[in-house]
From Swiss-Prot:
Descriptive protein name: Small ribosomal subunit protein uS5
Entry-linked SUPFAM superfamilies: dsRNA-binding domain-like, Ribosomal protein S5 domain 2-like
Complex formation: Part of the 30S ribosomal subunit. Contacts proteins S4 and S8.
S5 DRBM domain boundaries: 11-74
Entry keywords, A to Z: Ribonucleoprotein, Ribosomal protein, RNA-binding, rRNA-binding
Molecular function per GO: rRNA binding; structural constituent of ribosome
Superkingdom per UniProt: Bacteria
Organism expressing this protein natively: Aeromonas hydrophila subsp. hydrophila (strain ATCC 7966 / DSM 30187 / BCRC 13018 / CCUG 14551 / JCM 1027 / KCTC 2358 / NCIMB 9240 / NCTC 8049)
Keyword hit for Membrane: no
Length: 166
């Protein structure tokens, strides 16, 4: 599952998966490791990283550095989403919709780790298709970035926020 570490920079780091991979060469197999991590500030910023190295700690370090470089802003509404969102990457499709206070994170595996570090506390989520952690994480971040606040939608349409909210 996911391991959690806190850092002085107030970023939450989670390790989602470590895999052993091999490259076959004339002399045999060369083993290396890959690591998938997510990083977030718990307040609407989230990023993911994928690192590969000959040793596990080096792969994790590379993944963490990449995740910190690739932070995305997510629009939150009191610990949940503003509206339902859908994200797709490769064979994975994720669907998330806002939930009322006290619901918690109803999501599994890699998606749960992304939502926790992003600062989302109440959400209903489902993964369709492939549950490969890399594709699920990328689809989840894609969906979260698509989310827009009522103020952003109003500005895009040239209306007032009250008109958008009905």
């Amino acid at each position: 599952m996911a391991k959690v570490e806190s850092q002085a920079g107030e970023l939450q780091e989670k390790l989602i998966a470590v895999n052993r991979v091999s490259k076959t060469v004339k002399g045999g197999r060369i083993m290396s490791f890959t690591a998938l991590t997510v990083v977030g500030d718990g307040n609407g910023r989230v990023g993911y990283g994928y690192g590969k190295a000959r040793e596990v700690p080096a792969a994790i370090q590379k993944a963490m550095e990449q995740a910190k470089r690739n932070l995305n802003k997510v629009e939150l509404n009191n610990g949940t989403l503003h509206h339902p969102v859908r994200g797709v990457h490769s064979g994975s499709t994720v669907f998330m919709k806002p939930a009322s206070q006290g619901t918690g994170i109803i999501a599994g595996g890699a998606m749960r780790a992304v939502l926790e570090v992003a600062g989302i506390h109440n959400v209903l989520a489902k993964t369709y298709g492939s549950t490969n952690p890399i594709n699920v994480v990328r689809a989840t971040v894609d969906a979260l970035v698509q989310g827009q606040s009522p103020a952003q939608i109003a500005a895009k349409r040239g209306l007032r926020v009250e008109e958008i909210l009905g």
